[in-house]
Swiss-Prot record:
PANTHER family in UniProt: DNA-BINDING TRANSCRIPTIONAL ACTIVATOR DEVR_DOSR
Protein name as it appears in the record: Transcriptional regulatory protein TdiR
GO biological process annotation, one example: phosphorelay signal transduction system
Keywords associated with the record: DNA-binding, Phosphoprotein, Transcription, Transcription regulation, Two-component regulatory system
InterPro entries according to UniProt: CheY-like_superfamily (IPR011006), Sig_transdc_resp-reg_C-effctor (IPR016032), Sig_transdc_resp-reg_receiver (IPR001789), Tscrpt_reg_LuxR_C (IPR000792), WH-like_DNA-bd_sf (IPR036388)
Gene name as annotated: tdiR
Amino acid sequence: MQATKTGNASTVFVVDDEASVRDSLTWLLNSISLDVRTFESAKDFLDADISCTHGCVVLDVRMQNVSGLQLQQALSERGFKLPIIFLSAYGDAQMGAQAVKKGAFDFLQKPYRNQDLLDAVNAALALNREMADKQNEKQKHLDLLATLSQREMEILDKVVAGSSSKEIAKLLGISYKTVEAHRGRIISKLGLKSTGDLMHFVMRGSSHCSDCGRQPLPGSSPCRPAA
């Protein structure tokens, strides 16, 4: 494995068993100030400590022992999230379709134009940054929600489900004023100003439950039983 540092926050991981290809890709990517780490085999890449969360992978399809497609599958099973750009000298349309179907970002045929590769890498890095921003936003939601008490979470869940303060008070066996006090503290802890802001906050950090169609709170189980 070889690494070249330019100070860029993103890293392009190049996996190709041809030294000339690795060298040319390193030169090309360094020319636009991208950090590069190269590997001559899928095994070397799998054995490496890839802790970087910002970047993409440029991967040769046909390599000895473990092919690019097999490496893609292994990375998928490990939960590896960086976008993958495949390079192939064989122009196999079916193989390209298979790779993209399994989540590859792009598939380029050798010999490729330098600009085509740079465009693909820049697009992959932009996608990775977008994914990272969304993950960071989700984590911020979770961190804020973690400041709420169990009772506040119960009330928030019911507010999001559309229950009024009077309905929540009846469901939980507490007074209307207590519900309103909890609602105010929830809004304050989350750094919001209104119930409308509260609904928007939850919707931005949630996804629909595949079982019941409800939109659960971030970090909660999809179908939480009523308290």
